[in-house]
Amino acid sequence: MQDSHGNTQILNQANSMVKRTWRLLFRIATLILLVSIFVLSLIIVLQSTPGNLQNDINIIRKELNELMENFETTSKSLLSVSNQITYDVSVLTPIRQEAIETNIISKIKDHCKDRVIKEGSTCTLNRSPLHDVSFLNGFNKFYFTYKDNMQIKFKSLLDYPNFIPTATTPHGCIRIPSFSLGQTHWCYTHNINLLGCADPASSNQYVSLGTLQVLKMGDPYFKVEHSHYLNDGRNRKSCSVVAVPDGCLRNCVTMTKNETENFKDLNWQHNYLHTYHIMVPLKTRIINPPGSSRDWVHIAPGVGSGLLYAKLLIFPLYGGLTEKSVIHNNQSGKYFFPNSTKLQCRNSTMEKIKGAKDSYTITYFSGRLIQSAFLVCDLRQFLSEDCEILIPSNDYMMVGAEGRLYNIENNIFYYQRGSSWWPYPSLYRIRLNLSKKYPRITEIKFTKIEIAPRPGNKDCPGNKACPKECITGVYQDILPLSYPNTAFPHLKQAYYTGFYLNNSLERRNPTFYTADNLDYHQQERLGKFNLTAGYSTTTCFKQTTTARLYCLYIIEVGDSVIGDFQITLFLAA
């Protein structure tokens, strides 16, 4: 039975295969016949109407051209709509959102003023500091668009009330200013040495919180709403400040030894985050991010202000790495060096590379690899231990130094002090990936600026730019007034302002300037010739009701009758 059933299956399969073969042959024959009929018909038509063929071709071509034109028009229209949607989402929506927020703040402030005037009572909403409404939406912007042959100049320095207290004894020393201008208020801090600037053992810290208000003649003044004098025995140094909602945060390092001893000693010196909030008592906490005491011999804030970015609190850092640590091994041997257009170095490429590599390891700091970094904390949990240190690659950044972070129109920029062989201000654009709990650096772009050189020493003066190991310079941050050009080759593609010390070897001749990447537009020396000066920081803002731009320059000045160093303010418009 099994054999009979198997034979039947084979026979059925054979019959099925034959049927499929005949169907295929029939289909092929039919297709050939149809093609033949079409070809014969086409020949007959062409032979019978030879005179109309060219007309038919022209008509077809015309219709095809019209079809292509319609398609091109439709495509352009769709592309225009797509671009408009992109522009609305990425540009207009944030602007409108900011305008709505500004309007709400303005209405709240006006409401509070009316209540105080009409009822004679205090307005609880007034507990939160708010700038005068004429300045709202005038902060952290690019105020110009670069145009060839256009120069930026300020007309005059303004007389206005000073908001920074000065030294009160002949040997008092006030140094290291840090200033942060937020959307609702500003924060300021500086260090005070009672026994002169050379005293490393003890110091106090001043912090103030205030708002921008308007004088009767229309110019701004910096009104101090709250201030605090920290005199608790802790020797705070290198404090960076940032304005946060309803308060200020400062990142400081507490020192028990001088700077060179800190880089030599393996005993970790803690960083402290100080909360100065108008609603709550002063709080302090130790910052101890994962691996910090293992990877770093010493780490300090960058002095310049930090920033708020997408609910993250970010401070500049720099310090010395522990030899053979994970970060040290990752960064060792990496280097970055730009070539100066103005101060050309005649060294060979190999000599430049060797000098650049050597520049990261500083003999003065016990041979430590000196690294820049960023402290990142969740603003919503800044009273916890929840912080992390981000390490920028030295493939794209020069040797670690003091610095400042800017958030300008949602772009992060980082100023790095010229502490090594490069004499000019270093400015980088930083891009972050925010997809995880803490961000990761995805891009670092250097902007080559060749104005405002820092004073140096005989090994690395302010008028030379060959890569080599040295330690020198001074903190002189630079403020971009238009979007900095990070493309190569670098051209005159942005405007800047600040103070610099116009001396290649000594901290003398503080000079105010406006400039582009390569040339000054305006320079004005402060005070007498060879005046001693030091750190400087610059912040600009616009009075939106008058469209007038103001820039605040905060600078350390020596040679004072009272105090070794004072902090002096200038306001230009």
From Swiss-Prot:
E.C. number: 3.2.1.18
One GO term (biological process): virion attachment to host cell
Keywords per UniProt: Disulfide bond, Glycoprotein, Hemagglutinin, Host cell membrane, Host membrane, Host-virus interaction, Hydrolase, Membrane, Signal-anchor, Transmembrane, Transmembrane helix, Viral attachment to host cell, Viral envelope protein, Virion, Virus entry into host cell
Residues exposed to the Virion surface side: 49-573
Subunit note: Homotetramer; composed of disulfide-linked homodimers. Interacts with F protein trimer.
Domain notes: The C-terminus (head domain) is involved in binding the cellular receptor.
UniProt-listed InterPro entries: Hemagglutn-neuramid (IPR016285), Hemagglutn/HN (IPR000665), Sialidase_sf (IPR036278)
Segments in the Intravirion topological domain: 1-27
Segments crossing the lipid bilayer: 28-48
Residues carrying sugar: 258, 330, 339, 347, 433, 502, 530
Chain's role: Attaches the virus to sialic acid-containing cell receptors and thereby initiating infection. Binding of HN protein to the receptor induces a conformational change that allows the F protein to trigger virion/cell membranes fusion. Neuraminidase activity ensures the efficient spread of the virus by dissociating the mature virions from the neuraminic acid containing glycoproteins.
SUPFAM superfamilies from the UniProt entry: Sialidases
Main localisation: virion
S-S bonds: 173-197, 187-248, 239-252, 345-466, 377-387, 460-470, 540-551
GO CC terms of this entry: host cell plasma membrane; membrane; viral envelope; virion membrane
Gene that this sequence comes from: HN
Membrane topology: Single-pass type II membrane protein
Organism: Human parainfluenza 4a virus (strain Toshiba) (HPIV-4a)
Location of this chain's protein in the cell: Virion membrane; Host cell membrane
Catalytic activity: Hydrolysis of alpha-(2->3)-, alpha-(2->6)-, alpha-(2->8)- glycosidic linkages of terminal sialic acid residues in oligosaccharides, glycoproteins, glycolipids, colominic acid and synthetic substrates
Name the UniProt record assigns to this protein: Hemagglutinin-neuraminidase
Ranges where the record places region Involved in neuraminidase activity: 235-240
GO MF entry, a single one: exo-alpha-sialidase activity
Pfam families per the UniProt record, alphabetical: HN
Protein's UniProt keywords contain Acetylation: no
UniProt similarity note: Belongs to the paramyxoviruses hemagglutinin-neuraminidase family.
